[in-house]
A protein has these predicted regions:
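Metallo-beta-lactamase
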Residues: 5-9, 102-144
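Conserved beta-strand hairpin/beta-sheet module of binuclear metal-dependent hydrolase folds
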Residues: 4-68
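Active-site environment of divalent metal-dependent phosphoester hydrolases
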Residues: 21, 81-86, 108-111
């Protein structure tokens, strides 16, 4: 059963909640677990922003599949490759191999080192680069 939330017109939260964890990154106490935030934009092109930790992978994939409702996934934006953002990259690309990955040059390098296969290729973006997906244009920023 999917568990999604409409955030705005054509933008959906497709992440998942994990109530099992007591510590984030084995350091920071969690009283109510953690939320893995991933968003899906339905525009002229479909765009998935981040994935989720593999511990919630099944729920995450159900959410994405439900919102896509048979549409192809055109792009996967990976903000960085820590497991809470990118652990399900391989599974997403197995389900939607036509999806092109958009990420930073460093994240692209790490994806290759981690052995992720990206059949449709990688579009590397730098500070201030923009990508238009139809009605929505995204500006990419670097953050520590």
């Amino acid at each position: 059963m999917d568990c999604v939330r409409k955030v705005a017109d054509n933008l959906y939260w497709v992440g998942a909640n994990d109530h099992r964890l007591a510590l984030f990154e084995n350091i920071h106490p969690l009283t109510c677990g953690i939320s893995y935030n991933s968003y899906l934009l339905l525009d002229e092109k479909t765009v998935l922003f981040d994935t989720a930790d593999w511990s919630v992978g099944r729920q995450f994939l159900e959410n994405v599949t439900a919102v896509l409702a048979g549409k192809p996934l055109d792009y996967l934006v990976i903000n960085h490759v820590e497991p809470d953002h990118a652990a399900s990259v391989g599974e997403v690309l197995r389900h939607w191999p036509q999806a092109k990955v958009i990420t930073s040059p460093k994240a692209a390098q790490l994806l290759a080192q981690f052995g992720f296969s990206v059949p449709a290729g990688i579009d590397t973006v730098h500070e201030g680069d923009k990508r238009c997906f139809g009605q929505h244009t995204v500006t990419f920023l670097s953050a520590p």
